[in-house]
């Protein structure tokens, strides 16, 4: 195993795990923060894309570009919904539900690509769903108002949009990761520019701006660089295991710095979610399922 690549992956996931904490300190809305994040990522990753020479070697195919732009819409919505979830619920709960994305991908593969799903996978889906209910808190489901204000919907929507990004983007093979992210963040700028009020950025403290720019340049620029640079050098099994550094760091920061104290039911829910996800990611893929995969229209 490439130890340098593994270290880069661990650092990138650990940094991304702190994004919930950063979000809480920015003092701006989810939409405004994602808007700045898209601008920072476009500048940082676009600059690397040019400096490293990847831009000159890109193979542009119309279908891949369209697919990338569609992924961009879901990627930006994923960020907005995740940040809204951070505003409404604990970071631990939001990040646990957000990590249900692989479960959604499993379901989509079964419904649209004819991939086989066995009884163990169905059980994993059910366990993850129950876990998400436990994490939010059963008391939040006693009334419609409590449910709508719990942040559960935002967290589920963020997981779904992240899953759509993975599902639609799985057949993008010619464009580099820098090109796809550059195009997707450009989409985000155009999506959010009409709805973000510049008045939100007036009266912010220096600390607010440091957290805002940190979310943009560190969590989107630097983290994505480390992630892309290490991803191609590591086996899929190692990558699948190391991505759990992200939620682990997020939950630790929530407990240690933000004083989140989960109930025993929430702890059980977190265990259910990540148990189901780990099984889904690490279970062997039947050859028949691989053979049945086809490109999306």
Language-model-derived ranges and their functions:
Residues 1-35, 39, 73, 143-171, ...:
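Glycine-/small-residue-enriched transmembrane alpha-helix faces in small-molecule transporters
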Residues 2-5, 27-35, 59-65, 137-160, ...:
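Juxtamembrane helix-entry segments on the extracytoplasmic side of multipass membrane proteins
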Residues 27-33, 80-98, 175-179, 225-242:
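Structural motif at transmembrane-helix junctions in multi-pass transporters
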Residues 45, 49, 108, 120-139, ...:
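Hydrophobic transmembrane alpha-helices of multi-pass small-molecule transport proteins
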